[in-house]
Amino acid sequence: MGNVLAASSPAPPPAGSPPVPGLVSVPPGFTMPPVAGLTPTPDKKEPQEERLPNPGTFEECHRKCKELFPIQMEGVKLIVNKGLSNYFQVNHTISLSTIGESNYHFGATYVGTKQLGPAEAFPVLVGDFDNSGSLNGQIIHQVTNNIRSKIALQTQQSKFVNWQLDTEYRGEDYTASVTLGNPDILVGSGILVAHYLQSITPSLALGGELVYHRRPGEEGTVMSLAGRYTAPSWTATLTLGQAGAHATYYHKANDQLQLGVEFEASARMQDTSVSLGYQLDLPKANLLFKGSIDSNWIVGATLEKKLPPLPLTLAMGAFLNHKKNKFQCGFGLTIG
């Protein structure tokens, strides 16, 4: 009961006195045995089980490594961002190309007032409209603390091309999501994608992907399994399935340098490739450099330079394909 009795037997209580709560009453003529030699011990608290973290989404498994690789640039691009309020922003994009068609895009973004974190607010509405009449739109909303939904649609010259509905549920130590793409009840076609990712330990997460597609005269299912191990300075991810294998390794050398290795094997194309990418961040110089090289002897690099106090960002990129003897370069300017 947490109480320690004195070494000497206590004097018997006077007759008729009520028993002291919390103590066992002693019958008349009996004495308590001596308890000398017992030392008080502090109450021991049972160790609490460490809760496993949420592993994120299945689509984020390879993202850390993918973000290190430069994005191919070609031609000249001008982007102008303008914030009209704390919730609404528009942007204009002009792209001039010597290979493809030059185009103009107008985009708008609305962020709602449902604040869930320092950088998260819902609902989010994103739209992009180009000079040919094509439209890309997304609506993202946090329905509850655990459920997030997204609707995306794409039109091309006033005709619906793609649309999909995503629903994601985040538990304490797992994430499950379902995506329905281009469903057509009359024709009997559509794509269904299911993802599940579970934290096994604080460092290890395992999951799987199921893709079911159906259209007239064709029906099939593709499955794949994924595993990700996260350490303080590196992350290794492996995805195995009927379509092939995909493995990435991300390593953070220091605050300025990050490295990534990617391996891809396609069972349908009977082809494999290995890529090495790195990112060098120099905050004092407002400089960000990304470079990559792969087994097909394609070398690429991009350089981004911010020009404070002006709201300007310069971007330059170049890619060289040694096998095909092709070279592409691009230049971009972002205002705002």
UniProtKB/Swiss-Prot annotation:
An MF annotation (GO) of this entry = protein transmembrane transporter activity
Query: What is the annotated localization of this protein?
Result: Mitochondrion outer membrane
Report biased composition (Basic and acidic residues) as residue ranges: 42-52
Query: What Gene Ontology biological process does one annotation of this record name?
Result: protein targeting to mitochondrion
Q: Name one GO cellular component term.
A: pore complex
Fetch the InterPro entries from UniProt.
Answer: Porin_dom_sf, Porin_Euk/Tom40, Tom40
Keywords carried by this UniProt record: Ion transport, Membrane, Mitochondrion, Mitochondrion outer membrane, Porin, Protein transport, Transmembrane, Transmembrane beta strand, Transport
Provide the residue span(s) of the region labelled Disordered.
Answer: 1-58
Membrane topology is: Multi-pass membrane protein
Q: Do the record's keywords include Transferase?
A: no
The biased composition feature labelled Pro residues covers 10-21
Name the protein family: Belongs to the Tom40 family.
Subunit comment for this entry?
Forms part of the preprotein translocase complex of the outer mitochondrial membrane (TOM complex). Interacts with mitochondrial targeting sequences.
The record describes the protein's role as: Channel-forming protein essential for import of protein precursors into mitochondria.
This chain belongs to which protein, by name?
A: Mitochondrial import receptor subunit TOM40 homolog
Q: Give the gene symbol.
A: tomm40
